[in-house]
Swiss-Prot record:
One of its GO terms (biological process) is tRNA wobble uridine modification. Keywords: Transferase, tRNA processing. It catalyses: carboxy-S-adenosyl-L-methionine + 5-hydroxyuridine(34) in tRNA = 5-carboxymethoxyuridine(34) in tRNA + S-adenosyl-L-homocysteine + H(+). It comes from the Bacteria. GO terms for molecular function: transferase activity, transferring alkyl or aryl (other than methyl) groups. This is tRNA U34 carboxymethyltransferase. Belongs to the class I-like SAM-binding methyltransferase superfamily. CmoB family. Homotetramer. The keyword Membrane does not apply. PANTHER family: TRANS-ACONITATE 2-METHYLTRANSFERASE-RELATED. The gene is cmoB. The keyword Transferase applies. Catalyzes carboxymethyl transfer from carboxy-S-adenosyl-L-methionine (Cx-SAM) to 5-hydroxyuridine (ho5U) to form 5-carboxymethoxyuridine (cmo5U) at position 34 in tRNAs. Signal peptide: none annotated.
Length: 324
């Protein structure tokens, strides 16, 4: 199904990551043995994606792949049809041989908010927790990262990532593993750890922060992005049922409360670097994601509230450091 052999070889040569081989191959074998209704259809399309590196790859200002001579119309239409097999595309956008994959999320907007506050990523090893289809990992490569490892248990996200990476010539600087962070050993191996859009899905947010800290090298940097509410250090929303039609959500702290949480589990130099209300320009339905999206999740008479009456989505970015 999926071949993770190249990643095993890579970490076998890394003294810090090498112990991961004690558990990782069996975990991925178990994942591959689990049934999924759409996987055969997706893999059939993935196999038909043309192999070979695009002549021009821009990961710095966008994710754009092209050749000096554009694909002929028939080839482009065939490629677009294959890529549409992997609907819904939630994270992006991507431009692939003049095919614009207009995803539900403008993940590039989030990246533009995050990037100015990061320690330089050049030559860093990075873990991206809840990485989706790897869009932000590719942008990290654009900033010169040495290695990007993303974890996300979704079959579809992995297929989308492998499709884009195949068109990039199977770049071995980025790897997506279909795992949750709870399945990782305490690696203490990554210079930077990202957790963006994950915390509110965790039943125990403090435990999640500890798991993130356990993946960082001493002095490593955490980039945490999550939904927040307005309020002081004691403000936390715990929806009784749904929030913006999402069921699997638990805790929405204020940014100030989140700073206290990070400090309470041992992070230092914690900074709130950005707070931003999510607009319907950043998250919406498109031809590549035809299901309902943020416009349908807001109160039709008051866009400052969700349809359940909660505050509309607002996201904060915090930067923190693991002690030396």
């Amino acid at each position: 199904m999926f071949n993770f052999a190249n990643f095993y070889k890579l970490i076998a040569q890394d003294t810090i990551l090498q112990p991961w081989l004690n558990t990782l191959p069996q975990q991925l074998t178990d994942w591959q043995n689990a049934e999924h209704g759409d996987i055969e259809r997706w893999l059939k399309a993935l196999k038909k994606i043309p192999e070979g590196c695009a002549e021009n790859i821009d990961l710095k200002t966008s994710v754009t792949l092209s050749n000096n001579s554009p694909l002929i119309d028939g080839e482009r239409k065939k490629l677009e049809s294959l890529l549409r097999t992997f609907h819904p595309w939630r994270k992006g956008p991507f431009t692939v041989h003049d095919i614009h994959i207009d995803t539900e999320w403008r993940s590039d907007w989030k990246w533009d908010r995050v990037l100015p506050h990061l320690s330089p990523l050049k030559n860093r090893s990075i873990l991206d927790v809840g990485c989706g289809n790897g869009y932000h990992m590719l942008r990290m490569l654009g900033e010169g990262a040495r290695l990007c490892v993303g974890i996300d248990p979704s079959h579809l996200f992995l297929v989308q990532f492998e499709a884009i990476r195949k068109l990039m010539g199977n770049d071995q600087r980025a790897h997506l593993l279909p795992l949750g962070i709870e399945q990782l050993p305490e690696l203490n191996a990554f210079d930077t750890v990202f957790s963006m859009g994950v915390l509110y899905h965790r039943r125990s947010p403090l435990d999640h922060l500890i798991l993130l800290k356990n993946q960082l090298v001493a002095g490593g940097e955490l980039v945490l992005e999550t939904l927040v509410i307005d309020g002081d250090e004691n403000a936390v929303l715990m929806p009784v049922d749904r929030y913006a039609q999402m069921r699997n959500v638990y805790f929405f702290p204020s940014a100030k409360a989140l700073k206290v949480w990070l400090e309470s589990v041992g992070f230092i130099d914690v900074k709130i670097v950005d707070e931003c209300v999510t607009t319907t320009g950043e998250q919406r339905s498109t031809e590549w994601m035809k299901h309902n999206s943020l416009p349908e999740y807001l109160d039709p008479t008051d866009s400052s509230k969700t349809i359940e009456g909660h505050p509309a989505p607002k996201r904060a970015i915090l930067i923190a450091r693991k002690p030396d």
